[in-house]
Amino acid sequence: MREIKGFINGEFVGSGGFGEIYSPATGELVCQYHKTSIEQVGEAVDAARIALKGPWAGYSIQDRVDILYKIADGINARFDEFLEAECLDTGKPYSLASHIDIPRGAANFKIFADTIKNVGDEAFHMPTPDGTGALNYTVHKPKGVIGVIGPWNLPLLLMTWKIAPALACGNTVIVKPSEETQLTSTLLGEVMNEAGVPKGVYNVILGIGREVGEALITNPGLDAITFTGSTATGERIAAAASVGVRDSSLELGGKNAGIVFADCDMDKAIEGTLRSAFANCGQVCLGTERVYVERPIFDEFVQRLKEGAEALKLGRPEDPETNMGPLISKSHREKVLSYYQAAVDEGATVVTGGGIPDMPEDLAGGYWIEPTIWTGLPETAKVVQEEIFGPCTHITPFDTEAEAIELANDTPYGLASSVWTENVTRAHRVAAQMETGICWVNSWFLRDLRTPFGGAKQSGTGREGGHYSLEFYSELTNICVKL
């Protein structure tokens, strides 16, 4: 059984208390972690502050670029270790993590290394009454000590998506991973040391959110907080960040819709919807939990999606044929099952799934659940309105384009949407009316990482990606020089 410690000021530190991590695939105890104490949270913030004003402050942009490339190379050099840790933590298939989580976790550092190299400062000449003029120019400076609170669904990918731009801009970070998935954040500490990152630049605290997470977000030593997770937790973090007028970047929940028109490429629409509904066992903030299908193809679409869902193979993470893993925890499965029951109670037609699958004896203790499809519910139904974060989706027919747009936008969330049609003019027209941070056309989970990512409405504040991330992690000073 593994044992992990927090990472503070370049060293792994123990504590007096322990927490436990269980394998989502088997339910077995696989790791003990040292719970970071409240005092150690303060020490991490202090270490980050000292590093910010100390050696890290002397690094040029090119120095930081070189460091980021070394971190990326370090992750790739230990690819198998990160892969094993990520899949042990989450239960997700190796086939998924090896193609998405670990490569993107490394690539994020190179992406933002390249981005920071190409960010220019503005300069303007202005006239003055005496005719000599003045020069105005901007200077980018680090924002300071950043609290990074990560989710459990894509632990390494989404953590490095925040850490990489923060370090690129010269900040220091204290990372609080989810208590469910802490292995890769601590393993990254080893890579940071190997890459020559100064002590205190990267710190990791371990424990549950209401204890160490709360201690972190309320610490006055933080200059900004970035968070990915539920809307409810995001609201709490926003409130904490407002004390002291600190910045916060929040990527929150979604109740994402797909619109499928009768002229779509059916094969592509089915494949894309299957991925968006069931990838990572539905534990993706960008997942599609609502699908609106034009009536002439409704029955065919439902039948083909059913066949696709029933063909998914649940199994051990390391099995190359496994393409859907378990839910993250027993408590999360209970939550998702409560939604499955609510759908039935409200009169849903269960097209497929709706329960716990029969698994081999060695996996019977895991947190497995069936991929589920419903039809027949009104828009007011609980499973149509609330984010479930499980492998399930509800399909509704529509008759007109205007109706589909209205239905898709009828939610307090605004993270993502997708449109499936071969009519390019309609695709652009409908996509422009989606009240979401991103809208895919004939695709899903595809994005140039230089573009902005984030949610509208209750799905978050701020944008991440490319120079949009750098704006959050930088302070700008305008310098005006009289000539």
Over which residues does each language-model region extend?
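Residue-level signal for inorganic ion chemistry
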Residues: G27, R64, E86, G170, ...
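Conserved C-terminal structural/oligomerization subdomain of aldehyde/semialdehyde dehydrogenase
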Residues: T26-Q32, L222, K313, Y340, ...
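Structural signal for hydrophobic packing residues in well-ordered secondary-structure cores
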Residues: L52, W56, A72-F79, L83, ...
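N-terminal Rossmann-like NAD(P)+-binding subdomain of aldehyde/semialdehyde dehydrogenases
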Residues: M1-A134, I328
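Rossmann-like NAD(P) dinucleotide-binding subdomain of oxidoreductase/dehydrogenase enzymes
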Residues: D121-K268, F398
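A short hydrophobic/small-residue beta-strand
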Residues: T172-I174, V350, I438
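ALDH superfamily catalytic-core signature
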Residues: A224, A232-P378, V441
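Short, well-ordered beta-strand elements within core beta-sheets of diverse protein domains
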Residues: L29-T36, K53-A57, G147-V148, G258-F261, ...
